[in-house]
Amino acid sequence: MNQSHFFAHLSRLKLISRWPLMRNVRTENVSEHSLQVAFVAHALAVIKNRKFEGNLNTERIALLAMYHDASEVLTGDMPTPIKYYNAQIAHEYKKIEKIAQQKLIEMLPEELQQDYRMLLDDSYTSEEERAIVKQADALCAYLKCLEELSAGNAEFTLAKARLEKTLQLRHSSEMDYFMTVFVPSFSLSLDEISQDSPL
């Protein structure tokens, strides 16, 4: 049986810092970001199903979100202003991501490749699934801005404003629910979020 380097590569996502051009109070890596996006995407899917007549596979959504940035272990995390500077750069970067996704899939034993292709290759996801994961990704970036601003880091002021516009463009009922019910807590201190539920 041949060895596979797939999970050894994925373990290196923790070495890739996000927001590399910004001063951060606390550095965030791609691995922890992916887990937070999985939490939020799963929540959005549950909210959509329970409150807004959705019919999403919530576990699949969580897995898609968990792997949504996996290709960055080969490409690195390109800053958003560069990645989307114009349509041509965005298109070319998508092609690079696709190549990286395929390279990751090919690292797996052949008998496992199709299972992971369903998670890593965008062409196997529905428009609705992609939309939920993108909403969660944008929400998590927004939450990072709130955390940095709460810690006194004004560096994230413009990023927050840009992300507010992105969230308006990706607007949905489930996102509104999440923003109303869960997001305000991210601007509070540990004492403030703990006072209602002491151990």
Curated annotation (Swiss-Prot):
Subcellular location: Cytoplasm
Keyword Cell membrane: no
Enzyme Commission code: 3.1.3.89
Cross-referenced NCBIfam families: PRK03826.1
Domain (HD): residue spans on this chain: 30-142
Site note Appears to be important in orienting the phosphate for catalysis, residues: R18
Pfam families, alphabetized: YfbR-like (PF12917)
Name of this chain's protein: 5'-deoxynucleotidase ECA3034
GO cellular component: cytoplasm
Record: residues binding a divalent metal cation: H33, H68, D69, D137
Protein family per UniProt: Belongs to the 5DNU family.
Gene3D superfamilies: Hypothetical protein af1432
Taxonomic lineage: Bacteria, Pseudomonadati, Pseudomonadota, Gammaproteobacteria, Enterobacterales
Organism: Pectobacterium atrosepticum (strain SCRI 1043 / ATCC BAA-672) (Erwinia carotovora subsp. atroseptica)
